[in-house]
């Protein structure tokens, strides 16, 4: 079972490049492109690799500052949301990491920040160490769409992870519109699973189809009785009309079959929901799966009314690239 370094790591990484996160402006990224901060894969070290500007580094690295000031990057998050915590990762930056960093944020319904934008400090200046992860909980309950990441005075950071709950204005979604209720961009989040040895449970909610086998959720080979499962909180309560289970790239390691349970959960913690899910109603009866394919189920869906959570069961184990739960929102 995967061990999380911080509890908030189970939330969606709002700064994931796969969600569309990008740099809008940066004071300096001479040595390494600031957009590398958002790559979903861990940073790597490439021994002896240099480019025209110096040693190739997997992250954002600015020049040595020879005047007053500090470096900063303005970031548009792929999806706006409430931030639960951040990880400032300086992996492989040893003699060139910033001594400290801070984070500011703002929310814009449209457009990009300018000189008149009011920024809110969500993480005061914190000390950094080389080749290390720095986990910090954020207690601000506002939703934010943009960040300003400050490093003092210069240097390199490998990755910036911004974990939180995606925000969507559901008042703009028609009751007649069919929408993916579990999509990360719509606020869906994976909250618990039996195992995620080879791939994160959050991957199945990402947009688009998986780029490879690592861009999905895959469990270890099960050597004990039972089956693997993942619990997902819908972005908004709704009634399910169709489910898509995609096993793209999973050929010798796809599940033999799957089923889905659902429930309208009114309270409780994530750990309590894990136990309750055993007794949820059957939304999708057991269905056979095949390798490397999208499986659509509509006629097989049971009408169980509005729900807030689903539990995807895979038998006995294996990998799933994407999960789509299509339906209409309930007010």
Swiss-Prot record:
Biological or metabolic pathway of the protein: Nitrogen metabolism; (S)-allantoin degradation; (S)-ureidoglycolate from allantoate (aminidohydrolase route): step 1/1
EC number: 3.5.3.4
An example Gene Ontology molecular-function term: allantoicase activity
Statement: the UniProt record of this protein carries the keyword Hydrolase: yes
TM region positions: none
Enzyme class: hydrolase
InterPro entries, per the entry: Allantoicase, Allantoicase_dom, Galactose-bd-like_sf
Domain of life, per lineage: Bacteria
Keywords, in A-Z order: Hydrolase, Purine metabolism
Reaction catalysis annotation: allantoate + H2O = (S)-ureidoglycolate + urea
Family the entry assigns: Belongs to the allantoicase family.
NCBIfam families for this protein: allantoicase (TIGR02961)
Protein name, UniProt field: Probable allantoicase
Organism in which the protein naturally occurs: Pseudomonas savastanoi pv. phaseolicola (strain 1448A / Race 6)
Recorded name of the encoding gene: alc
